[in-house]
Amino acid sequence: MSIKTRKIGWIGAGRMGYEMAQRLARGGCDITVWNRTRAKAEPLARDGAKIADRLTDLAGCDILFCMVATYADVKEVIAGPQGVYSNARAGGGGVPPIVVECSSISLDGSAELREILAGFGSKYLAAPVSGNAKVIKAGKLSFVCSGPKPVFDEVMPFLKLI
């Protein structure tokens, strides 16, 4: 599948997440972005991104990226009462088959997230980043990835675009 035919969900439009999502949008990806403060994500629409009203709007994406501040935030947006997976618990709707977590979270948090996602049948790639917004704009962001090789291979074209 082409990167332009995969549906990408993106959570987090802060300093780093905004720039990362923007590179995907400008690269022609079909990307839908959610941010707690919607106004911070709205400018991404000029680059072709769709803006989600609810986290559950991202449940039907092929690959979900998450770039938020803390593990508590990660857990809330993924598995919280209003999180991406909240309808799946109630039996209403699909879930992303792949989740790529780009925040810097603890090893324990990453292991817990992997277990939560596995319970829904989703695959997990830990992909914390090294760099800043200037590095992202220059296309030089570094990822430190951990997870199954087939998942890494599937996500790699998007990581390269970022």
Which sequence ranges carry the predicted segments?
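Rossmann-fold dinucleotide-binding core
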Residues: 104-162
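NAD(P)+-binding Rossmann beta1-loop-alpha1 motif at the extreme N-terminus of oxidoreductases
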Residues: 1-66
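Active-site-adjacent beta-strand anchor residues
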Residues: 34, 67, 103, 145-146
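Class I S-adenosyl-L-methionine
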Residues: 25, 42-46, 75, 114-118, ...
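A short acidic, helix-capping loop that chelates divalent metal ions and anchors anionic groups
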Residues: 41, 74, 134-137
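Rossmann-fold NAD(P) dinucleotide-binding segment
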Residues: 55-123
